Amino acid sequence: SYSTGRTNTAKDWESLVTDLNVCSQRGLVQRFDSTIGGATVLMPFSGRTQQTPVQAMAAKIPMINATTSTASVMAWGFNPAVSEQSPYHGAVCAVVESIAKVVAAGGDSEKCWLTFQEYFERTQGKAERWGKPFSALLGAYKAQLEMECGAIGGKDSMSGTFEDIDVPPTLVSFAVSTAKAEDIISAEFKCPLSK
């Protein structure tokens, strides 16, 4: 895991760029066919050489015997380092990050809905172990109120313990919205000197 301190040494940079959370996902992405159904608006990698990872999924809404220009836009948010330190703040960040990615890709935050995937250690009858999922749900609830974006579903698991090994507190937020397909924004630089 990389340092979250304010130092800026070569060791810190090496630790950051070798962390699994920032490594390339290309091998995993290539195991899935992103063109199924022919409705893909945003491929997993964009740019002239298809090297820039996208922040969101965008695909036209499936239609029977018709066409549409409306696309669904979906993105996720989760930071394991923050969530391990504070499940509350991790959940707040997850909600904000998922919505921000949707908006960055061209989705509308006012037409955005959320769903959560939660995964926590077994409580094993210990009251203090309930604090992690409780604080994560409070954080997610606070973020929903502040962002004016509600969760319409989710999936939870409290079985993240094997012998004496516990999963880190996990609340992944998925944000979903719509946009016109022609308004979807990919992540790569569009021209020289882009910022």
List PLM regions with ranges.
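Glycine/proline-enriched, intrinsically flexible loops and inter-domain linkers
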Residues: S1-K195
